[in-house]
Design a protein with these regions (language model features):
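Short, structured beta-strand/loop micro-motifs enriched in basic residues and often containing a Trp
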Residues: 4-13
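Acidic, aromatic-enriched beta-alpha/helix-loop junctions
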Residues: 28-65
């Protein structure tokens, strides 16, 4: 039996009215670890709001299995709304 391997996850900014992000910014996670070199700013308010979905995506749970067409979530800090999409990816070696 092979060992389970988590998915790497990136958060892509879909839209933003916040000065911390612009559309297209990305945040990269390798397991529970943030890739600081590749990532844009990290807002803990936003991340905390939808972290359970990030965790599920890391464990290879798909958007469809979670009941969504895509994993797009909004930061709850009003009025500076930011929409993030969670994307599972694998490094090409």
């Amino acid at each position: 039996m092979s060992e389970f391997k988590e998915c790497k996850v990136k958060l892509v900014v879909k839209s933003s009215k916040c000065e911390l992000y612009k559309s297209g910014d990305e945040i990269y996670l390798d397991g529970a670890v943030l890739n600081k070199e590749k990532s844009a700013n990290v807002c803990l308010t936003a991340i905390n709001a939808f972290y359970p979905f990030i965790y599920a995506a890391r464990k290879r749970v798909t958007a469809e299995q979670m009941g969504f067409d895509e994993l797009t979530f909004q930061c709850p800090d009003c009025p500076e709304t930011v929409e993030f999409t969670i994307v599972q990816y694998e490094d090409i070696e």
